[in-house]
Curated annotation (Swiss-Prot):
It holds the Pfam family UbiA. Its cofactor is Mg(2+). One of its GO terms (biological process) is ubiquinone biosynthetic process. PROSITE patterns: UBIA. The chain crosses the membrane at residues 25-45, 48-68, 101-121, 142-162, 165-185, 223-243, 271-291. Disulfide bonds: none annotated. This is 4-hydroxybenzoate octaprenyltransferase. GO terms for cellular component: plasma membrane. It catalyses: all-trans-octaprenyl diphosphate + 4-hydroxybenzoate = 4-hydroxy-3-(all-trans-octaprenyl)benzoate + diphosphate. The gene is ubiA. It comes from Alkalilimnicola ehrlichii (strain ATCC BAA-1101 / DSM 17681 / MLHE-1). It is an enzyme of class 2 (transferase). It is a multi-pass membrane protein. It is found in: Cell inner membrane. Its main location: membrane.
């Protein structure tokens, strides 16, 4: 096929959609927990090289995760209202293109992590395995959201390893909070697709929880906040940290109000609201580390 400007422009747009460059919310949901971990590991002053590598690595691996997700779901997405427009669902990107792009993105991310220490490099192999296997979990288990949380949260122990050369116990508390958080917001996200998922046999926590979804999400929200309180106690954080958590609790209450009738658009709004929640927790951490004395 002739490489005309129009063709290249079209390919770039298809790949941008495939990697969700047009939907940056996922970038933030990945970045916030990593930033919590890195700032706590560094006591407020992260190494610039580590910060740059991790921000770029998170963005690249999120793009790779979106690609392999669409590859795995290529036969399902055409039957789900929200995903019928995706490039693989309507044949605008081939399977070979998608797999090639996934491999290239993973290699670029691995090239970045090679700038880090051996422990971080070893942990990165787990990150790739989690990212590559997550999209297939919905065929075999009702808990793909938990797997997603592990994939999203794995940047936390990696950040500790890169910054300090070790993974402190508090890193695993933060990792647990990230798993819980992803389970919360991805269940809200899955509530948008629940009717379609039931028809085509796709598993999710939203399908499993059924009418108990709001109550279970509420329990998970409470446990997540308790874990973050424990993390703050372990490292001696002060008032600003807990003010950030109080703000997060208020947003969790708002999300419960949004999903009260389980309308698709309101469940999606609750999902999007988590970006503000992650940012407020990070703001509380920043203020505490730099102004808390």
């Amino acid at each position: 096929m002739e490489m005309t400007a129009d063709y290249l422009r079209d390919r770039a747009w298809q790949y941008a959609q495939l990697t969700r460059l047009n939907r940056p919310i996922g970038n933030f949901l990945l970045l916030w927990p990593m930033l919590w971990g890195l700032w706590i590991a560094a006591k407020g002053l992260p190494d610039l090289k580590v910060l740059v590598v991790f921000v770029l690595g998170v963005l690249i691996m999120r793009a790779a995760g979106c690609v392999i997700n669409d590859y795995a779901d290529r036969d399902f997405d055409g039957h789900v209202k929200r995903t019928t427009h995706r490039p693989m669902a309507n044949g605008r990107v081939s399977e070979r293109e998608a797999l090639t792009l996934f491999v290239v993105l993973c290699l670029v991310a691995f090239g970045l992590v090679l700038l880090m220490n051996p422990l971080t490099i070893a942990l990165s192999l787990v990150a790739v395995a989690l990212a590559a296997t997550y999209p297939f979990m919905k065929r075999y288990t009702h808990f793909p959201q938990v797997h997603l949380g592990a994939a999203f949260g794995w940047a936390i122990p990696m950040a500790f390893a890169a910054q300090t050369g070790a993974v402190a116990p508090v890193a695993w508390l933060l990792f647990l909070s990230a798993v819980l958080w992803a389970t919360i917001y991805d269940t809200q996200y899955a509530m948008v697709d629940r009717d379609d998922d039931l028809k085509i046999g796709v598993k999710s926590t939203a399908v499993l929880f059924g009418q108990a979804d709001r109550a279970i999400i509420g329990v998970l929200q409470g446990v997540m906040l308790a874990v973050l309180v424990a993390a703050g106690l372990v490292v001696g954080l002060g008032a600003f940290w807990y003010l950030g958590l109080a703000a997060a609790a208020a947003l969790f209450a708002y999300q419960q109000w949004l999903i009260r009738e389980r309308r698709r658009e309101d469940c999606f709004r609750a999902f999007l609201n988590n970006n503000w929640l992650g940012g407020l927790i990070f703001l509380g951490l920043l203020l505490d580390l730099h102004l808390g004395g």
